[in-house]
């Protein structure tokens, strides 16, 4: 049995992190989402993976280069997930599982879905958090059978569909999927798009039973920036909690002066130098140095080729990508993609895209005077995230000047610059530079002013 991983969406809700990459290539604990999905599929006992790749498909091909178990099929732009799935039919000759490329799965849930699929079409159900039913296409089940679906319902519903299991007999329904959703209430306005849930609804209308498996995990869907921050925090907790003893790779050393309140996993040729403080479990890649009094205050994941030094502070739950520098007095909490440079008394909480360079003393606000959460605009819709709303989100390849300030919840697009001394209170689009224009006065001055 194979798994199909869908990676065809544009990821506009995840702005700015899906501009220069496929949404499924966004990293969680330094591994792309689609790589986590493929790993979970193989751990569940599936034999192969087919990835239906939309934007930036070449990045996904590069990620799985040399892995003969994974086939990446570019599908271009489609009219929705159902059409993305139909585009890879030639790769599938028997029953198969469909996973979303932007979702984190537990292998046990995928294995349970595969077992259910042996008895007919099946779906994996994840519980909808309280109050979030209007954000999802929801489902109801009874007695292990799917009863109905409804798009973004007004009244609470218990589940959403996180993954699918289709038999070959389902292909006529997959290939005939409409772009006009029927399963909505009066007043709802669905986009013209082929959703996988519409295929399942057609199966039900045809009298075909669809079995259900309720996921033990939350099957976290990474659709918006704050969900990416949450996904990384949860993955750090999961990976670090599995670390039960110190594990040092070849050539790695820990100085006797280091204070470790937990366990450490080091890759090859790593150094933890004098006076470092580690309060939690720490996972580190290869060729990384953590030296000169650096403080890591909780569980963390740090990539390869990093330099963490000179009394900097990394908060618990954080992720540093590969080839990052966190230097003199820098304070960081959140997620940094690869090749990020943090230095000289800067302070940041949120997400930093790859190759971001923060100027000295760049800081971000994290607390509003009303003690509330920042209201966001996601594709024009007002949203108030329950978590991480006040974090700062900086896109890939951005820079800041010295003393730049981010207000709570602001975002910058890719390839943008926040100039010296700027207080950024609103989102900055991609490919823009904002410079502070100040008014100054020049007057004469001399020793005469002092009575000479």
Task: Please place each PLM-identified region on the residue numbering.
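N-terminal nucleotide-binding beta1-loop-alpha1 segment
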Residues: 1-18, 436
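Conserved N-terminal catalytic core of the sugar/cofactor nucleotidyltransferase
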Residues: 2-5, 13, 27, 31-99
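Short alpha-helix within the catalytic core of nucleotide-sugar-dependent glycosyltransferases
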Residues: 38-39, 57, 86, 107-118, ...
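The conserved acidic donor/metal-binding loop of glycosyltransferases
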Residues: 100-104
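Conserved donor-nucleotide/metal-binding helix-loop-beta segment in metal-dependent transferases, i.e.
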Residues: 108-134
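Catalytic-core segments of class I nucleotidyltransferases/pyrophosphorylases
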Residues: 114, 145-240
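Extended, small-residue-rich solenoid/repeat segments and analogous flexible loops
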Residues: 193, 201-295
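Glycine-rich hexapeptide-repeat left-handed beta-helix
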Residues: 309-319, 323-452
